[in-house]
A protein has these predicted regions:
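Extended, loop-rich substrate-binding clefts of extracytoplasmic carbohydrate-active enzymes
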Residues: 80-127, 147
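Beta-strand secondary-structure signal
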Residues: 108-110, 120, 131-135, 273-277
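Low-complexity, serine/threonine/proline-enriched polar segments
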Residues: 166-216
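N-terminal secretory signal peptides that target proteins for export/translocation
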Residues: 1-20
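Bacterial N-terminal signal peptides
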Residues: 22-35
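Acidic-aromatic substrate-binding/catalytic surfaces of carbohydrate-active enzymes
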Residues: 43-96, 103-104
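Acidic (Asp/Glu-rich), glycine- and aromatic
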Residues: 125-180
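Beta-strand-rich recognition/accessory modules
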Residues: 40, 99-101, 110-112, 199-303
Length: 303
């Protein structure tokens, strides 16, 4: 299309009937594309792109058909002993977030937790994933109280639910994780329905005390791995996320799913590396698992 338009501008001396032909061709191409449901745009960026807006990290892509993914990043840094504790009075540790760099492909953030912990985030958008590389440092002379933290991806639009609906669980049938080595749609079996705060669902891995997770209903089953996700409204795409190390998998009340990452309480002077992924890929689960297992070899699948 650009070639045709350049052709028109560079040949102003041609007879009028010759100039009209390319324009007719261009119009025909655009009309045919519209009839087929194809969106024709100029210079459309390839892959995913990022925007930092207040406390949200926004993921955009032409593949999302206008449904951007908004991630509350980070929602909270959290203390241990959180499963049956007051979320505000006990669990959440205040923090501030400073944007160091904000471009469409790379965002750098520095978080300062009120107990002195400093966490530097390097977030990079790729063709069909967002990569997270975190460095947590405790420059103080006391152990940090931050044992885990949560990024909250809001996925209602991606899942295709009615934005006017007041049913905050309407997206749950689109959500999944892995139990007994197989994909399990939510609500899974033995869905827990009692907790300090309702509704929601938490899955705790074997390496984390069951007293140190989100104060929502705690499922009795242990997840097979650290991957959790949501199918798109038409089931053609999957949003999935994982972190290493991870604290829990969580289906929440903001039409969200979390793979919350683990800090473990850094000792004085200690530094830790944390990494994470968001995948926005075709709904080919075997291929997704292969990719996840390559990215997170530490996450051995349990059956």
């Amino acid at each position: 299309m650009r070639f045709l338009l350049r052709h028109i501008h560079r040949q102003p001396t041609r007879p009028e009937w010759l100039c009209r032909v390319p324009r007719i061709v261009v119009i025909a191409v655009v009309m045919a594309a519209a009839a087929c449901g194809t969106r024709v745009t100029a210079d459309e960026p390839a892959g995913l792109s990022l925007v930092r807006e207040k406390n949200f990290l926004i993921v955009r892509s032409s593949a999302l058909s206008g449904a951007e993914i908004r991630i509350n990043y980070l929602e909270a840094y959290c203390r241990a002993g959180s499963t049956d504790a007051d979320w505000v009075k006990h669990t959440v540790i205040p923090h501030t977030s400073e944007v160091v760099e904000a471009g469409p492909q790379t965002v750098r953030i520095r978080d300062r937790v009120s107990d002195g912990l400093v966490v530097d985030h390097v977030i990079t958008a790729g063709r069909d994933e967002v990569d997270f590389r975190l460095t947590a440092t405790n420059p103080t002379d006391k152990r940090s109280e931050a044992h885990w933290a949560q990024a909250c991806p809001r996925l209602g639009a991606f899942a295709g639910v009615d934005p006017q609906s007041r049913d905050i669980e309407d997206y749950v049938p689109k959500c999944f994780l892995f139990l007994d080595g197989s994909l399990a749609r939510m609500p899974t079996r033995d869905w827990a329905k009692q907790a300090r705060y309702m509704p929601g669902q938490v899955w705790c891995p074997t390496h984390v005390p069951r007293t140190d997770v989100n104060p929502r209903p705690l499922n009795p089953h242990v997840p097979s791995n650290g991957l959790i996700g949501v199918f798109s409204g038409d089931e053609s795409l999957v949003f999935a996320t994982a972190w290493e190390p991870y604290q829990e998998l969580f289906q929440g009340v903001a039409r969200c799913v979390h793979a919350d990452f683990r800090l473990g309480g850094l000792a004085a002077g200690e530094t830790k590396q944390i990494r994470g992924k968001v995948y926005v890929v075709p709904a080919d689960i075997p291929k997704l698992l292969q990719r996840y297992e390559k990215d997170f070899p530490e996450h051995q699948t349990t059956k």
